[in-house]
Amino acid sequence: MTLAIEWAEKYRPQTLKEIVGNKKAVQYLRTWAEKWLSGIPDRRAVVLHGPAGVGKTSTAHALARDLDWEVIELNASDQRTAGVIERVAGSAASMNTFFGGKRLIILDEADNIHGTADRGGMRAIAGIIKNTLQPIVLIANDIYGLTPTIRNLCLEIKFGSVQSRSMVPALKKVCESEDILCSPDAIQQIAEGAGGDLRSAINDLQAAATGRKTLEVEDLSTSGRDVKENIFKAMQRIFKSTDCKKALEAARGLDESPEDLVHWIDENLPFQYASKDGNLEDIKTGFGYLSKADLYLGRVKKRQNYRMWRYASMLMVCGTSVSKTRPYPGFIKYQPPSLWKKMGQIRSKRDLRDNIASKVGEHNFESMRYSRNNLLELYSRMLKNEESAIEITAGLGLELEELIYLSGSTKASKKLQKIYERAQELLLEGNEESDGAEFFRTPAPPGNSKEDLSVFSVNNSVEKDGKHSERLEVPNSRTSQGGQKTLNFGFDIPPEISPETKNSENNTSDTIKPGNLAPDILAPVTLTPDSFTSDTLIPEQDQAEIDDIGIKSDSLTSISLEHDSLKVKNSSSLPGPVEKEAFSDSEPIENSISPELSRSVKSVNREPAIKKVSDNSEKSEVKVSETPKKVESKTQKTLFDF
């Protein structure tokens, strides 16, 4: 006999054929799963609900093995907040497997997702079910522990208690595998004492057979297992019985507190004691006992004295049983408390309202509280216009349920469905072309926009006469990252340039041809004697002075201008080429040209600056300052403006 693991886990069914009991429920689950093989069914998730130990989780795992599906499971031992569920189950539900098969997502004990530890879990499950591409199985003991939204999205399959006659063959098989001789009476007693819980029956068998090779009835424990009473059976015993003791036993066997039990009795008492002749005395008497029980429940909360639960339970149970004056035959379908349903609806609407307020606040850079108190009513009024409703739905990314709530409707009308469909089309177009609806496009936060700084550009164009003219272009408008347009401040045309500046630039353009560079940046250009004519370079007032000096333009063979260095190579007769880089408006070039030419150079006003060269150097070399001077507005002369 091996005690390494529990027998209930060791002999867990591996296929659907090995499942004990609930054959119809297993068949329903198999039919639903086969629909996934040909596409996505209408109900993308299923809820297996029923008592503990009847094989719900084992059936889900057996289904995955039969269909060769991968399994991802989240149970009560895992943290199941909204973030965890979306990270684990959400990612698994939205992606296909590597080999193209299906992945079964199992959420065990889904009805126990509540409290601070599992904050937002129910809402995350509902969102995953709506968009899942993989089958999802929810397992719950109490179907009413799930929200109405999840229940409407899922296919409900109920698992009932396993009959004792179905347990006996399974228990005999376990005894044979463990080499234990167990009498039929002992097996029958274990099966009947399990209360329909096969897992508990196997655990009882393991506990009784520990250290034994044979098992008889005398070896079994005299105390039986505490069996939880079903709420519907307990309600039947309370309303049908006239014995107060039996009614109290049924109530004590429930896994319900007196605060919950009083709501069950309050909901079903008018239906159970309804009389055809219109006599309401029994109903009046029953509610009188319930009101007194409610007083004790209030004192329990106020004084924290839980001993008063005893008196409250006796009043609500025994008072209801003895309040009837005659029996009420017939079957009554007992309903869960409507108060819980209303509270669930209110909680669901409150969560829906907060989600909408969060989206509105994010779009308007406001808090959720401010949006909830001040902006939701404004947006609700804006939905009355169909075009505005479409832009709001697309801009905020509203779901159909959120659109229904914000519009104040109770159900999805054809108009709202049309608005939602057009908003989805607008979102698809926005993803392909731009950022969606222009009016409700979320602007970029302050300080994070990356503006295009190249607003102004200099356009160097070559005119017909070969001269370069610089034109400052100002765009009419530009669009920022957030989609907002910026005005051009009235600069539809380039700013006017003063005539003096134009003359200065025209004079410079004949001697210096910078290409596509800005006018204040020198580029290497070679000038030949053909480039200099008296008509273009030498003013008439300076022609006489040049003739007196005796320098002819054809004696200049070449002048080379470079950006980094300046070299002037010449003698009194200028036999060779003259290489020039920059000129100074303050100091003359010595030992390179004649004194007469040096005096003429003093009158030259050029943009770059040069430094004085030593007297003993054979050839003059000067360096250009790294930061060139700005072009002055006054008229400037070139080298040959003598």
UniProtKB/Swiss-Prot annotation:
Residues 464-473, 604-635 have a biased composition (Basic and acidic residues). Keywords: ATP-binding, DNA replication, Nucleotide-binding. One of its GO terms (biological process) is DNA replication. Residues 432-452, 464-518, 568-642 are annotated as: Disordered. GO terms for molecular function: ATP binding; ATP hydrolysis activity; DNA clamp loader activity. SMART domains: AAA. It comes from the Archaea. Residues 476-487, 500-511, 589-603 have a biased composition (Polar residues). SUPFAM superfamilies: P-loop containing nucleoside triphosphate hydrolases (SSF52540). It holds the Pfam family RCF1-5-like_lid. ATP binds at residues 50-57. Part of the RFC clamp loader complex which loads the PCNA sliding clamp onto DNA. Heteromultimer composed of small subunits (RfcS) and large subunits (RfcL). Belongs to the activator 1 small subunits family. RfcL subfamily. This is Replication factor C large subunit. It comes from Methanosarcina barkeri (strain Fusaro / DSM 804).
